[in-house]
Amino acid sequence: MPTDLIRYGSISPEMLAYLWLLIEYKNSIMVAGEVATGKTTLLNAFSLFIPPQMKIVSIEDTPEIRLYHENWIAGTTRSGFGGEEYEITMMDLLKAALRQRPDYLIVGEVRGEEAKILFQAITTGHLALSTIHAKSPEAVIRRLNAEPMNIPKIMLEQLNAICMQVRLIYKGRFVRRTKSITEIVEYDPKIDDIILHDVFRWNPEDDTFEFSGESYLLRRIAEFIGISEKEIINELHSRAEFLRNLCKTKPNFEEFVKKICEYKEYHKGD
């Protein structure tokens, strides 16, 4: 649950409010990190911001994603015990998923040639949420651009944001933190590289999360819905305060989704 992550100190209400806005306005997000850093946990948590009526297709090797949406279709790979013709790969599932025309596509982990199909889907307007094994946002770009994925850098700018997960010892105990949320701004042909911008960063000195105050994606959302940058930042803080207060009630899934829907209904037309 998103509220659990806030209570554990893994992420701030502002960061989750930011991800809520990104998901609501169809931005693709990748969660990166090493083993046991909480990548799937965060992916699962912010997937709960997907409106309940939307069609979701998830694809995984091992079933870890847990959603409660009525229109959720879960796909899992299968080894070909009776030969290769009986094998179901990530590529097979991804191709089948796109034929179902989902509103949201969730891929448990991207690591092979299926990334090409995923980015083709993003380029044609599908929203994708996924995880990847990498140590930094820059490493995400390098891995996606290299074998066996081979995603052209100019296509990588279709991905909107990268959440960086870490597991470390802080004040004598193991903790998980969302170390940063980084926006993919654009591909710069002059340097043949992707321009990145950190919107949020974890400060290990006092275990707080810092907002840079500037977001290209929030600016784009503001332009899309016809409001000012100041208004979209105010909306970010409004949603953060809502999530902060929601933590106090320790809601279950049904209560959480109901409150999210009530918030959106109450603020409709603001």
From Swiss-Prot:
Annotated CDD domains: VirB11-like_ATPase
InterPro entries in the record: P-loop_NTPase, T2SS/T4SS_dom, T4SS_GSP_E_ATPase
Gene3D superfamilies: P-loop containing nucleotide triphosphate hydrolases
One term of GO molecular function: ATP hydrolysis activity
Pfam families: T2SSE
Family, per entry: Belongs to the GSP E family.
Protein name: Uncharacterized protein MJ1287
Organism from which the protein derives: Methanocaldococcus jannaschii (strain ATCC 43067 / DSM 2661 / JAL-1 / JCM 10045 / NBRC 100440)
Source species taxonomy: Archaea, Methanobacteriati, Methanobacteriota, Methanomada group, Methanococci
